[in-house]
């Protein structure tokens, strides 16, 4: 299927078609904690199990993710101006036989030359030289308060068998964004170092800028299944309000469940034999208002009935929604299955807002269906 035919795509559709060739894409922007890092690692472990990766691959990916996440948590205490967003971000993507692990955080400009020197040194060495260099650093005992003298960089290069890809983008005279990416090949290839495609890192840099502009915290593009829903809920927990606002967290969790199940149960796509349905979920927040957006493929012949169902929900007031809810349940019981309409009603009742939706036509058979809902702390 050609996903490039729509000449005026929405943001989520444009992002979906760019990421569609990945079998896994997880993007998080915000504050990092040990608990959140553990959840990200757990998510990766679950997905690697689903891909039936070898034990060797899982160990390599896990180690590099752990080092990248530790680097973020160690350095996210850099002091910034109020106007400067100091959020860090983390990305893991699987493309054909490779995992791409990318991290980003703010760094003080005065530390760039030292870090560049370490990265350049590591990239200049072959496998045996890296081993000797690791021993040399250990013998010298050059450890800093931040947790090392480049040992993690050396080990990531050794375990991945690839060069370290990196970039710095100046924010102001004191701070810069540091971007770091490493590739792990699957299945394992012959030892040797291959240059990573810098265009992939450049794309991530541009994506991070868009994510910041649109106040997004989480993007999850994967095959949606009941199992993946558990991972999604686990990862969104750190992005929703504070721990005391249980009502808000529960409300958003329930809406995420409905939106995700809408993809899993009602998305259309060419027969592939896989269990899940491809789709994308985004979560953003600005001034206490959360925006949840999902997108997936549907058949064009379903657009009219789906639009009618959504319009009926949007036009109903909240008293009418109760009646519509009961009526829809009875209709679903007659048909012997739950339709998407019941989920739409539930989403509006919980969010107290109408649902925004849009269709991006792809070809004669399929369109990309996106749906968005806003939830406020004040509601």
Predicted regions and their residues:
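Conserved short strand/loop->alpha-helix "switch" segment adjacent to the catalytic nucleotide/phosphoryl-transfer site
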Residues: 42-67, 139-146, 234-257, 276, ...
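Short alpha-helical basic/polar micro-motif
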Residues: 66-67, 154, 257, 261, ...
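Helix N-cap and loop-to-helix transition residues
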Residues: 33, 54, 108-111, 126, ...
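Conserved beta-strand-loop-beta-strand hairpin that lines the nucleotide-binding pocket
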Residues: 6, 13, 17-26, 39-41, ...
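C-terminal effector/catalytic modules and regulatory tails appended to multi-domain proteins
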Residues: 1-58, 191-242, 249
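Short amphipathic alpha-helical interface segments enriched in basic and hydrophobic/aromatic residues
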Residues: 49, 70-74, 261-265
